[in-house]
Structure formats: structure tokens, C-alpha cells
From Swiss-Prot:
The keyword Ribonucleoprotein does not apply. This is N.vectensis toxin 1 4. It is found in: Secreted. Expressed in ectodermal glands and in clumps outside of the extodermal layer. Is not expressed in nematocytes. In adult female tissues, shows similar expression levels in mesenteries (gametes-producing tissue), tentacles, pharynx and physa.
Length: 85
């Protein structure tokens, strides 16, 4: 009887996994919009030395900059980079 229950549970899981819908892929424009809204603004080297009057044109990315973005801060950090497009 216990093996019958195990078979039923396994079949139910198989049906649930097989019928799961895949999420639609985002277009490049949607990805750019979401990338630009992600993260914390940071000051690039081109924004000037004064952080209070800087326009904060960069965005902090954990790890490294994604494709299409470039590192805009001169110092090196293992944890995060200040990137802009």
C-alpha cells in the first residue's frame, strides 16, 4: 500500500512539472528598461569629483557589468562595479 502511494505522488509530481508553463522571454528593450531601473545610482568618474553635485549617471552592479554596459569608475572592487551604458 505504501508503494502505491509513492507511485501516485511521483505521478502527480511528474504531471505538475510537465504541465508547467514557461515564462515568455523579454525583448531587448524590456531588458534595457529593467536593467536601467535596477540597482543603486553611483557617480562615474566623468560626473566630477564632488559627489554632492554629481549627476550619478552610473548604476551599481553586483559582480561585474553586464553586456552592453561599461565600468565607469577607475577603482577596482570585487563585490560591485559602477557601470553605465
Amino acid at each position: 500500500m505504501a508503494s502505491f502511494k509513492i507511485v501516485i505522488v511521483c505521478l502527480a509530481l511528474l504531471v505538475a512539472v510537465a504541465s508547467a508553463r514557461r515564462r515568455d522571454m523579454m525583448s531587448d528593450d524590456e531588458l534595457d528598461y529593467h536593467y536601467s531601473k535596477r540597482g543603486i545610482p553611483c557617480a562615474c568618474d566623468s560626473d566630477g569629483p564632488d559627489i554632492r553635485s554629481a549627476s550619478l549617471s552610473g548604476i551599481v552592479w553586483m559582480g561585474s557589468c553586464p553586456s552592453g554596459w561599461k565600468k565607469c569608475k577607475s577603482y577596482y572592487s570585487i563585490v560591485a562595479d559602477c557601470c553605465n551604458q
